[in-house]
Regions:
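Amphipathic alpha-helical hairpins/coiled-coils and adjacent low-complexity
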Residues: 1-86
Length: 86
């Protein structure tokens, strides 16, 4: 694989990561909307199921944030390597 091919592959990967970020951000937005509705609905509920649902939503929100951080780190790493290639 030539340097040019590596650069092209890195550029394509960066574009795919942008698409992935957009998708995950959309999922996060939908999740936040659903979480607000769920939390409002379960506001006064002390049932175990309600607490499990609250924890599950909080975990899902954390996972979305983690996925976005991983995408950012991957893109930054690829960009750094691309710059190092010249």
């Amino acid at each position: 694989m030539s340097i040019g091919e590596v650069k092209a592959a890195l550029d394509e990967a960066s574009q795919l990561l942008d698409q992935g970020r957009t998708t995950v951000e959309g999922i996060g937005d939908s999740l936040n909307e659903a979480a607000e509705l769920m939390l409002a609905t379960l506001h006064d509920s002390g049932r175990d199921e309600a607490e499990k649902a609250r924890r599950a939503v909080a975990e899902a929100v954390r996972e979305v944030k983690l996925a976005l951080r991983v995408i950012t780190a991957a893109q930054e790493s690829g960009d750094d390597f691309r710059r190092a290639l010249g």
